[in-house]
Amino acid sequence: MKTHSLRWSFCSTARTGKPNNSKQRLRKGLLLVIRKVAPISVAAIFYALEVSITRKLKNYTPTRFMEKTSHYDVDAADYAVMFIESLCHTKGTWARKPFELIDWQEQIIRDIFGVLKPNGYRQFNTAYIEIPKKQGKSELAAAVALLLTCGDGEERAEVYGCAADRQQASIVFNVAADMVRMCPALSKRVKILDSQKRLIYQPTGSIYQVLSADVGNKHGFNTHGVVFDELHTQPNRKLFDVMTKGSGDARMQPLYFLITTAGNDTKSICYEIHQKAKDIIEGRK
C-alpha cells in the first residue's frame, strides 16, 4: 500500500549555526520532523519545510503540504492544543505551571491533529522529531501520549511508550503520570499503575503502556499510538519494525510519534530515518 509522507526541518541557526553535512546535523542538533500520511497515492511523495524556533506561534498557517483533498480543521487543531495546554509542567521552576506550547511545538500539534482527510481522519500518521537536549522532549512526548490515550475519542485505544530499555521508556511515562496527578479532570478518570508502568483511561478503557527493546513478545498489538523516545539508542530495528509495521492497521488514524536527541551510530534505525529526512529536505527524494 502506497503512502504520502511529509518531512519537516526545524533548524535553530541562532543556537547551532547551519550544519553542512549529516554528521554535523547530528552533532549540532538539527531538528528534523518526518510525518508519514495515511495511504493516498500511487507514489510516495515527500516534502520539506524549514521553520525557525520562536517563543510562541503568532500566526499559524496550515502546512503547504496538505493534500488538495484534505482540509485544516481549526476546531480539531484547537482542541489538541487546548488539551495539551490544560496539562502542567512537572519539574523544576516550571512545575505545576501550564504547559504553554511554544512556536515549533504548536506547529507540529496543529499540523498533526488539524490536517484532516475528507473522511475526517488525520492525514499524517507518523512524526519524527530530532531536537537538542533540554528542549522539553519528554514533556511534549508525554502530552501527546495522553492526548492519544485520553482525548482522541478512540475506544480501547492502545498507546505504547517505547525506548531502548524500560528505564528510558519510563521517563516519558513518569512525566505523563505526574501530568495526570496535576490535572483534576484526568486524575478522576485515569488509573495509574506505577508498578506496571501503565495508565488506564477508564471512560474508554484505553491504555498507555511502557515497552522496551526486548521484542520477544511484542506482537499482536492493536496500536492507536506509539511514542518512541530516544530512537537513536535503539540497539537494532526490531522494536521499531514491530511497532510501526502493521500494528495499527486495524485503527483508522494511528499515530507514530518518534522523538529523539542526536546520536552518532550511522548504522542505527534513527540514522536511517535521519538520512531519509535529509534526502527529502535537500531535494533528492
Protein language model annotation of sequence segments:
Residues M1-S5, F10-G17, N21-R25, G29-K285:
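Phosphate/NTP-binding elements of NTP-utilizing enzymes
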